[in-house]
Swiss-Prot record:
Protein name in the entry: UDP-N-acetylglucosamine 1-carboxyvinyltransferase
Membrane-spanning parts: none
Keywords (A to Z) from UniProt: Cell cycle, Cell division, Cell shape, Cell wall biogenesis/degradation, Cytoplasm, Peptidoglycan synthesis, Pyruvate, Transferase
Catalytic activity: phosphoenolpyruvate + UDP-N-acetyl-alpha-D-glucosamine = UDP-N-acetyl-3-O-(1-carboxyvinyl)-alpha-D-glucosamine + phosphate
Function: Cell wall formation. Adds enolpyruvyl to UDP-N-acetylglucosamine.
Organism: Nitratidesulfovibrio vulgaris (strain DP4) (Desulfovibrio vulgaris)
Length: 417
C-alpha cells in the first residue's frame, strides 16, 4: 500500500492537461455489453476503476484491451455473471445490470462495493427495472435478475439518481417500445452516455433535461467515441491553484459543466477565465474569502467537489458553511483537516469552517476518493510535511495525480507504507 509525502508551501505554476472523465467512462464501458460490434474508446483515464471494469467486461464476454488512452472492446460470447471478486471493489459495477438484462434476459451481479460514503442503495435501480418487466431476488450476496424481454415503461425517480438514470437509459435502448425517465439525472456524464448510445444507433431524446425519452431499437452497432474531460479532476486543479497562490492553465478543461464550481471559487477570491488556450486559474490580490456551499444535483454544486473546496475554505478569511445534501457521512475528511490545524465543526449534514492563517503538515488518512484529494490539496498549502495514507482511494479517481502536480512545481513523492 502506498502513501504520498507532500512538502507544502510551493505555489503551483504551469499547464495541466485534464484527463478523461472516470464517471463518464465507467457507464460507457459498461454499455459495451449492449453492442454487437467492436467499440473503440479514446481519452480514457488509466485508473484502478477503469482497469477493474475492463477485467469485468472480459469476464462477461466483452474482451477489453488498454493501449495508451484507448480502450478497444470486442463483444462476443456474453455471460450473465459479474463475480464478487471484481464487483466488491467498485460501486459502478451495478451498471452492468441493465445492459445484461437487455441483451441476455438475465443477470447475476454481486452486491457492489466502492467508497464508504453513505448507503447509495441500488433499490432505485431494481424498482425501476421491475417496471420494465424484470424480476429480482437476492441469493448469497448476488442480485439475480431475469426477464423475457424488457418492455418500455414510464418511470419516475423520487430522486434524480445518476446511477439509476444510467442503468435505465442503457436497459431501455433495447427494450420494446418507448421508455420515459422522469426526474432523471441531468449530470454531464449522463449526457455523455446518451451521446455514446446514440452514436451506436440508440434513439434518445431529452438527455440533459429531467425527462428523457428512449425508443427501443433491435440492436446497437459499434463506433469510436471520445470520453468527455473529467470536470471533477479539473475542479480539483482549479482549487490547487487557489490554495497554493499559484497560476495554472488547464487544457482540455470543461467550462459550462464547471459553472457552479467556478462561481463559488471566484466568490472566494479566485480569478478563473476561459482563454483560447484553456482555462486560467489564479488567486486575486487580497486573499481568499469565506463563502457558503450547498451540494445539489447538477446543475448545482457537485458533491464530488465538496471536500476539495472545504480545504480552500480552511485558509479563507471569515466563516464558510457547507451543507451536504447528496450523501450522508461525507465529512470523514474533516477530522483529518483538523489534525492539520483547520477549525471545522460538524452539525448533522452541515460543516462550519472558520478560516485559519495556516495549515501544518501532519500524517493523515484518506477515507474515500474525494476526501483523499482534499488532503492532498491541504498538504500542498501546509507548512511542513504531510503524509497522506491509504491513497488507493485516490488512485481510483485520479490519474497519477502526483505526476501532474509535480510537473507544475509541487513536491510530492509516492512511497510504500
Amino acid at each position: 500500500m502506498d502513501k504520498l509525502v507532500i512538502e507544502g508551501g510551493v505555489p503551483l505554476t504551469g499547464t495541466i492537461n485534464v484527463s478523461g472523465s472516470k464517471n463518464a467512462a465507467l457507464p460507457i464501458l459498461m454499455a459495451s455489453i449492449l453492442a454487437e460490434e467492436p467499440l473503440t474508446y479514446t481519452n480514457v483515464p488509466r485508473l484502478r476503476d477503469i482497469h477493474t471494469t475492463n477485467k469485468l467486461l472480459s469476464i462477461l464476454g466483452c474482451p477489453a484491451e488498454f493501449e495508451g488512452d484507448t480502450v478497444s472492446v470486442r463483444p462476443c460470447d456474453l455471460k450473465p455473471e459479474a463475480p464478487y471478486d471484481l464487483v466488491k471493489t467498485m460501486r459502478a459495477s451495478v451498471l452492468c445490470l441493465g445492459p445484461l438484462l437487455a441483451r441476455l434476459g438475465e443477470a447475476r451481479v454481486a452486491l457492489p462495493g466502492g467508497c464508504a460514503i453513505g448507503a447509495r442503495p441500488v433499490d432505485l435501480h431494481l424498482t425501476a427495472l421491475e417496471k420494465m418487466g424484470a424480476r429480482f431476488e437476492l441469493e448469497e450476496g448476488y442480485i439475480i435478475g431475469r426477464c423475457r424481454k424488457l418492455k418500455g415503461a414510464h418511470i419516475y425517480f423520487d430522486f434524480p439518481t445518476v446511477g439509476g438514470t444510467e442503468n435505465l437509459l442503457m436497459a431501455a435502448t433495447l427494450a420494446e417500445g418507448e421508455t420515459i425517465l422522469e426526474n432523471a439525472a441531468r449530470e454531464p456524464e449522463v449526457v455523455d452516455l446518451a451521446r455514446f448510445l446514440i452514436a451506436c444507433g440508440a434513439k434518445i431524446e431529452g438527455h440533459g433535461t429531467s425527462v428523457i425519452r428512449i425508443q427501443g431499437v433491435p440492436r446497437l452497432h459499434g463506433c469510436e467515441y471520445a470520453i468527455m474531460p473529467d470536470r471533477i479532476e479539473a475542479g480539483t486543479f482549479l482549487v490547487a491553484a487557489g490554495i497554493t497562490g499559484g497560476e495554472l492553465l488547464l487544457t482540455g478543461c470543461p467550462w459550462e459543466e464547471l459553472d457552479a464550481v467556478i462561481v463559488k471559487l471566484n466568490a472566494m477570491g479566485m480569478h478563473i477565465e476561459k482563454t483560447s488556450e484553456g482555462v486560467l486559474a489564479k488567486r486575486r490580490n487580497g486573499g481568499l474569502r469565506g463563502t457558503d456551499v450547498t451540494t445539489q444535483p447538477f446543475p448545482g454544486f457537485p458533491t464530488d467537489m465538496q471536500a476539495q473546496v472545504m480545504s480552500l475554505m480552511c485558509l479563507a478569511e471569515g466563516t464558510s458553511v457547507v451543507q451536504e445534501n447528496i450523501f450522508e457521512n461525507r465529512f470523514m475528511h474533516v477530522l483529518e483537516l483538523v489534525r492539520m490545524g483547520a477549525d471545522i465543526r460538524i452539525s448533522g449534514r452541515s460543516a462550519v469552517v472558520r478560516g485559519v492563517k495556516r495549515l501544518t503538515g501532519a500524517p493523515v488518512m484518506a477515507s474515500d476518493l474525494r476526501a483523499s484529494a482534499s488532503l492532498v490539496l491541504a498538504g500542498l498549502a501546509a507548512r511542513g510535511t504531510t503524509h497522506v495514507q491509504r491513497i488507493y482511494h485516490l488512485d481510483r479517481g485520479y490519474e497519477r495525480i502526483e505526476l501532474k502536480l509535480n510537473a507544475v512545481g509541487a513536491r510530492i513523492r509516492r512511497e510504500a507504507e
